[in-house]
Amino acid sequence: MMGKLEKPVIIGIAGGSGSGKTTIAHEIANNINEHDRIMIMSQDSYYQDNTGVPMEKRMKINYDHPDAFDMPLLEAQLNQLLHRKPIELPTYDFTQHTRSNETIHVEPADIIILEGILVLFNEDIRNLMDIKVYVDTDDDIRFIRRLERDMKERGRSLDSVINQYLGTVKPMYNQFIEPTKRYADIIVPEGGENDVAIDMLTTKLQSVLNQ
């Protein structure tokens, strides 16, 4: 699909796990009049391929550290989309803790929303973005959301979610994720509940599409 813009626009949405990044991304996409001109990418798709790593070790990997992500692949595929070339988007199997063999064929779009905990961490990826957003949500709310998601959607036990949160999620948030807030053009408090911020971002992107 060829868009009308000379160059696609990339908006990066960062924030801690459970902050409301995905909700905001989908709310914006749903509010845009021309749905076929906008796409959403999740940084979660770019976790490293751990196929050769034993399951016991996979379960102990720190998935909230920057090294857990295949940043070169993410950067390369963003560049492909910027040049109006389709990509084969990797998929990640959270139950097996590794990359799936299946990919998703994705055509370029005029607006690319990239959401993930560390999308603002890598300078090269950050430099590809036109708008950088950080979603700032209370720690307790984020933990409850993550707990519900991981147990319902990813088959995790209560103890494993709590242990992971205390062992890696919270420390990595403080060390790597929260500091990327300084790179944001827009800081959104209250996550996906912030209708004013969602409306503002939607209006901005709609005006870009209408040019």
Curated annotation (Swiss-Prot):
InterPro entries found in the cross-reference section: AAA+_ATPase (IPR003593), P-loop_NTPase (IPR027417), PRK/URK (IPR006083), Uridine_kinase (IPR026008), Uridine_kinase-like (IPR000764)
SUPFAM superfamilies per the UniProt record, alphabetical: P-loop containing nucleoside triphosphate hydrolases (SSF52540)
Binding site for ATP: 15-22
UniProt KW Transcription keyword: no
Any GO MF annotation of the entry: ATP binding
GO BP term, pick one: CTP salvage
CDD domains referenced in this protein's UniProt entry, alphabetically: UMPK
Pathway named in the protein's UniProt entry: Pyrimidine metabolism; CTP biosynthesis via salvage pathway; CTP from cytidine: step 1/3; Pyrimidine metabolism; UMP biosynthesis via salvage pathway; UMP from uridine: step 1/1
This enzyme's EC code(s): 2.7.1.48
Compartments it resides in: Cytoplasm
UniProt entry keywords in alphabetical sequence: ATP-binding, Cytoplasm, Kinase, Nucleotide-binding, Transferase
Keyword set includes ATP-binding: yes
GO cellular component assignments: cytoplasm
Catalytic activity: uridine + ATP = UMP + ADP + H(+); cytidine + ATP = CMP + ADP + H(+)
Major subcellular site: cytoplasm
First-tier enzyme category under EC: transferase
Family (UniProt): Belongs to the uridine kinase family.
Name of protein: Uridine kinase
Source species: Lactobacillus helveticus (strain DPC 4571)
Lineage, broadest ranks: Bacteria, Bacillati, Bacillota, Bacilli, Lactobacillales
